[in-house]
Amino acid sequence: MVPPQRAKNDTSSAPDSAAETRGPLVSSGSGLGRRKSATARVYLSPGEGVFVVNGRDINEYFTSKLHRQFACQPLKILDLLGSYDVKVTLHGGGASGQAGAVRLGIARALNTIDPENNRKPLKSAGFLTRDSRVKERKKAGLKKARKAPQYSKR
């Protein structure tokens, strides 16, 4: 028996995204992210895409759209944005450091859930690397970490 021919532009049986080739989401995971002086504990569970940060909605917690996008990048590149419920507990730091900590925590949680499919794209995007840059301390005799007071020759 000969299988029926498909039209060239018919993609009904072809997977549309990486999420469809993965199968059903059944596993949960957690990850710890740090950036500057911020620490984020991230818990992922299969769900409708509810994103809660310290008991508040992400839109309420991160008022800047840039910080929200930055925090959600790992889910976006894996095409899992509405697939997991995300619960985050944040401590310390400012908005930028906290967004970076959430991003690292989500990436590590996704890596623990499915390392075979998730590790390579997360690693190539640089989401599994901890950004170790921190503020340099102020030194005695200087105005800031490296800024010296104005010098007068005479």
Swiss-Prot record:
Disulfide bridge partners, by residue number: none
One Gene Ontology MF term: structural constituent of ribosome
InterPro entries per the UniProt record, alphabetical: Ribosomal_Su5_D2-typ_SF (IPR020568), Ribosomal_uS9 (IPR000754), Ribosomal_uS9_bac/plastid (IPR023035), Ribosomal_uS9_CS (IPR020574), Ribsml_uS5_D2-typ_fold_subgr (IPR014721)
The keyword Calcium appears for this protein: no
The organism's place on the tree of life at top rank: Bacteria
One record GO biological process: translation
Gene Ontology CC annotation, any one: cytoplasm
Keywords: Ribonucleoprotein, Ribosomal protein
Compositionally biased intervals (Basic residues): 135-154
PANTHER family given in the database record: RIBOSOMAL PROTEIN S9, SMALL RIBOSOMAL SUBUNIT PROTEIN US9M
Family: Belongs to the universal ribosomal protein uS9 family.
Name of the protein: Small ribosomal subunit protein uS9
Organism in which the protein naturally occurs: Tropheryma whipplei (strain Twist) (Whipple's bacillus)
